[in-house]
Design a protein with these regions (language model features):
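N-terminal acidic leader/helix
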Residues: 1-34
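Broad gene-expression machinery/nucleic-acid interaction feature
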Residues: 4, 49, 60-62
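Short, solvent-exposed secondary-structure boundary/capping segments
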Residues: 56-67
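Glycine- and charge-enriched low-complexity intrinsically disordered segments
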Residues: 2, 68-72
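A structural detector for beta-sheet-dominated domains
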Residues: 8-10, 50, 64-66
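Short beta-strand-centered aromatic/proline hotspots
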Residues: 45-55
Length: 72
């Protein structure tokens, strides 16, 4: 049975610091979809996925996201 993979989303702030947005289990279908997408919507905000890191020690996929600029 597939329990998915824990994914941690980090936002890169303008100052260069990282802020954790969330941590949740993704299905393997969602993880596989990362091969085909550049943008992720979470909490009603759109981000560009710029890097990913597989943390084997903790069994987690860590994604670095940059917020998209919105004109308003």
């Amino acid at each position: 049975m597939d329990n998915g993979l824990k994914v941690i989303l980090f936002e890169k702030l303008p100052e260069g610091d990282l802020q954790m947005i969330e941590e949740r289990v993704w299905s393997m279908n969602m993880v596989t979809a990362l091969e085909h997408v550049n943008y992720i919507v979470v909490g009603g905000r759109e981000f560009e996925a710029v890097e990913g890191r597989l943390n084997v020690d903790e069994g987690k996929l860590e994604l670095l996201l940059v917020p998209m600029r919105t004109e308003g």
